[in-house]
Amino acid sequence: MKTKAKYQTWIRMYKLLIFLVISLMLFLVTLLSVNLYLRILSGFLALPFIYIAIILSYSVYQFTAFGGNYQSKIHDLIVSKVNWDGKGKILDIGTGSGSLIIKLAKTFPKSFLTGIDYWGGNWEYSKAQCQQNAEIEGVYNRINFIKASASKIPFNDEEFDVIVSCLTFHEVKDAENKMEVIKEALRVLKPGGEFVFLDLFMDEKMFGEKKELLNILKEYDVSEVNGYKLAEEMKIPRILLNKKVLGNAMILSGKK
């Protein structure tokens, strides 16, 4: 039986378990023979935890292959936005468990690809998992995985023909200004090279207003840039449009 690649979802399972356990504990207090006010208080306290646990649980289901498979569908959408002859080098920033970069490797069989990620910590991805998935999918010989922060990409200026990133920039902890992370990504893109970034770009507290964001990108030597709301590019279940999930998601694509 052929081994299948294992791709983790964007939802960290330990967070889901925390909310489930707290919800269950608070709910159980309401069933105990204790002070009535304590039971009522526990019930009220349980509500937000139950709400978040439901959203996270349903999001995991919709992102997985046995559910809605939306994580793979979103990666397919990003790949479809890459308008390129396939000859050259691709960089995937925040490669996770390798799903997006492996799709790119299959779509562009003459390309050479690099995936960077910080892995470790409380993330449930690993470099070893990426390498194993790439080997299973038959593209291992064309992909190099490197542990690195998106705020300090370990490559020279103008090294890549295409750069992609999916829901990574807002997670970079060692860069308070997320626009600097985008600037760093564009630093290693060749003149005339293409980029496709998907992130929570509609979160104005993090990235500013859309018009301002696009203007700043033009200051980073970008010759062409377009912004697309993810919800307008593909049909997404309503619960995934929660602001904490994909409600603020937007695709930025263009050329340097």
Region locations from a protein language model:
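Class I SAM-dependent methyltransferase Rossmann-like catalytic core
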Residues: 8-16, 53-77
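Conserved class I S-adenosyl-L-methionine
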Residues: 86-96, 114
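Core SAM-dependent methyltransferase catalytic element
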Residues: 234-256
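Conserved SAM-binding loop of SAM-dependent methyltransferases across substrates and taxa
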Residues: 97-109
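Conserved SAM-binding strand-loop segment of SAM-dependent methyltransferases
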Residues: 138-150
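A short glycine-rich, Lys/Arg-flanked "PGG" loop and its adjoining helix->strand segment in the class I
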Residues: 178-191
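Conserved beta-strand signature within the Rossmann-like core of class I S-adenosyl-L-methionine
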Residues: 192-199
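A short acidic, Gly/Pro-enriched loop at the edge of an enzyme's catalytic core
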Residues: 151-163
